[in-house]
């Protein structure tokens, strides 16, 4: 635990990106660990991530920091769509950081854990950036996107990379040739635990992610299983 040297009851802000549910779910074991070590946790989440974490931690205080709203394209490559959304993303990051400063002062925040929210760094407060995508994949703009990615990551005190450095499950996503200045691999994290259960279903699909791609993928999955017998 990065804040282990702090006294108990220090106030930690945990803020996952609302881009599917993966960012929120992988913050759950981190929040549980903070609570176990007697930290005071405050959560900032939006959309589906808010509803998931509110159900998981109904007793925890939530604060609102409007996040980046990236749109997935229906027809164009994601890299092209992302390029045209850069001004909107940068403006949203600016407002994230401006709002954060007010929240840090109002709630006396001692530490920040940001899961892929680029604007949640602070000069006077220790801040952690969580990611497994150091090298965002793009056919056309890989180097430019990585420079922007690292520009913001290096503003944080430390960058937690959610992967095992040796096993490297995420491949080039989490272990590119060039790494940010403040990276630290923290291994694999999940809120799920292994347990033996009676098999009820033959197939199980777990879908998440931003729209409209999530629904498009759901339609593909449903179409592909039509010929499978019970």
Feature-to-residue mapping (PLM):
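Short internal beta-strands
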Residues: 41-47, 158-164, 230
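Conserved catalytic-core segment of nucleotide-activated headgroup transferases in glycan assembly
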Residues: 26, 33, 192, 203-230
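Conserved nucleotide-sugar donor-binding subdomain of glycosyltransferases
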Residues: 78-119
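A short helix->loop->beta-strand "cap" motif at the edges of active sites that frequently abuts
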Residues: 39, 124-126, 156-157, 181
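A nucleotide-sugar donor-handling region in carbohydrate enzymes
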Residues: 131, 136-143, 147-213
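Short, polar loop motifs at secondary-structure junctions
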Residues: 45-51, 112-119, 190-191
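Structural motif
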Residues: 11, 110-111, 158, 202
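Conserved nucleotide-sugar phosphate-binding/catalytic loop shared by glycosyltransferases and other
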Residues: 9-11, 17-18, 36-37, 41-86
